[in-house]
From Swiss-Prot:
GO MF terms held by the record: 3'-5'-RNA exonuclease activity; tRNA binding; tRNA nucleotidyltransferase activity
Organism whose genome encodes this protein: Anaeromyxobacter sp. (strain Fw109-5)
Presence of the UniProt keyword tRNA-binding in the record: yes
Protein name stated in the entry: Ribonuclease PH
Family annotation (HAMAP family): RNase_PH
CDD domains linked: RNase_PH_bact
Length: 238
């Protein structure tokens, strides 16, 4: 039993609350235990230069943490004048993950931007952003279809993400901050709802780990992502 009372394969209490923003075309407040991320989707009727002329659309993401989302106040990146390397890495991950959910040609020559803002952080902010960002994206695309802007929904598949790691030799999913900081191995797994991998990020802390542990962690993550898919479907029905 983990210190927070969960079993090794148990997710934290996951709540995906859709439609929380009055102005955004799609929105979702993703709560994974004490990690809370506000995800909004905005539609722009143009594409970035590298996509212009292809007839396809684009999905991208921005990520940020509120100053007091952590134990001690962080300076806003805007006040420092530039985004940090961690921020850039995470928002690129979110964008890659959510593009895997979309037929970009069916989207047409428009861009959907996901803004993922961490209100409170207790581990797994990037995976919460992807899981909640998918709901916000799906709502935005549904709205375009309902307004007849799109003839068909370009959403091709669901995408979700979860952290997984080795904690005292045990494979555990959805790590909180305390577990993440002491894990022997820490991974983030992004996958479609039918179990196809989109991205796997994994790091050994201290000593290498065998392939068998990698397989066990990926299997546990995919099982958890299957349950997250159900939460996403519930949110989109709500």
């Amino acid at each position: 039993m983990r210190t927070n009372g969960r079993g090794p394969r148990d997710l934290r209490n996951v709540v995906l609350e859709p439609g929380v923003s009055k102005h955004a075309e799609g929105s979702c407040l993703a709560r994974f235990g004490d990690t809370h991320v506000l995800c909004t989707a905005s539609v722009d009727e143009k594409v970035p230069p590298h996509v212009y002329g292809t007839g396809a659309g684009w999905v991208t993401a921005e990520y940020g943490m509120l100053p007091r989302s952590t134990h001690e106040r962080m300076a806003r990146e805007a006040a420092r004048g530039k985004q940090g390397g961690r921020t850039l890495e995470i928002q690129r991950l979110i964008g890659r993950a959510l593009r895997a959910a979309v037929d970009l040609r069916a989207l047409g020559t428009r861009t959907v931007t996901l803004d993922c803002d961490v209100i409170q952080a207790d581990g797994g902010t990037r995976t919460a952003a992807i899981t909640g960002g998918y709901v916000a994206l799906a709502l935005a695309l549904r709205g375009l279809q309902q307004r007849k802007t799109l003839s068909r929904n370009p959403l091709a598949r669901s995408v979700a993400a979860v952290s997984v790691g080795l904690v005292e030799g045990e494979v555990c999913v959805d790590l909180d901050y305390g577990e993440d900081s002491t894990a022997e191995v820490d991974m983030n797994v992004v996958a479609t709802g039918d179990g196809a991998l989109v991205e796997v990020q994994g790091t050994a802390e201290g000593k290498p780990f065998p392939r068998s542990d990698l397989d066990r962690m990926v299997d546990a993550a995919l099982e958890a992502i299957g349950r997250l898919k159900e939460r996403q479907e519930q949110a989109l029905r709500g």
